[in-house]
Amino acid sequence: MPRKKEVISGNFVRYDAVVLGSGPAGEGAAMKLAKAGKRVAIVDIREQLGGNCTHVGTIPSKALRQTVSSIIRYQRDPMFQKVGEWKKFTMKQVLSNAHRVIQQQVATHTRFYDRNNIDVFHGRAYIQDKNTVIVFNPEGVKETIVFDQLVIATGSRPYQPQGLDFKHPRVFDSDKILDLDFTIQKIIIYGAGVIGCEYASIFIGLNHKVDLINTQQKLLSYLDDEIADALSYHLREQGVLIRHNEQIDHLETHDDYVEPVSYTTFHNPDYIG
């Protein structure tokens, strides 16, 4: 259990350093400061530690990818094909394993903070002045923290292009896709960077139809041509439809599906089913 916070005044607590965000950068800074003998507090908007990396980024996506890879190996193994019929796994089943991995990571990170005597505040932080942070916890209770040093490591969030209705229940960004709780037949992934390619391989591995829309001429153009070409080849071989030089202008939304209206560099707007 986290140690009891030392109240210096009836109105605030004081620390040598306060870190905003408990992802890899925030955690690294907090640990280094604590090991240097500083009195440290960390603030995170979530009710669990780990930051975006643990909850919506690297950890869950790699857990998903590992699970799907295991499913693919199982389905292709001749020995298992003989002893039982082919089984189709749903995204919901695969996500349950990712959530289990997330909880394991949260427990590990919590032990790190306990071991290094770092106080943890959960809530939204507001910088009041150069030495004061106000934190409102999930219950709305206000806590005032006074500090000498402040580290801001609040992470990032997915870019949401204008004109796309991300409030629609069938439109997800790379953070919200982990909340998918219904069966899908086809998914269109807009953006063919590292995250887009990774999720394309995950969904095609679960036997969903996948369109990968790339606004550029080739995948991951910063890579050597041989690597980018190999990636394109393997995605296509698995069944991913890669659509280069294409951008989505807007979405036509329906109750149970969305239809992107897209255009290429060389053509007028066209309906894509």
Where do the PLM segments sit?
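A broad helix-preferring feature
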Residues: 15-16, 196
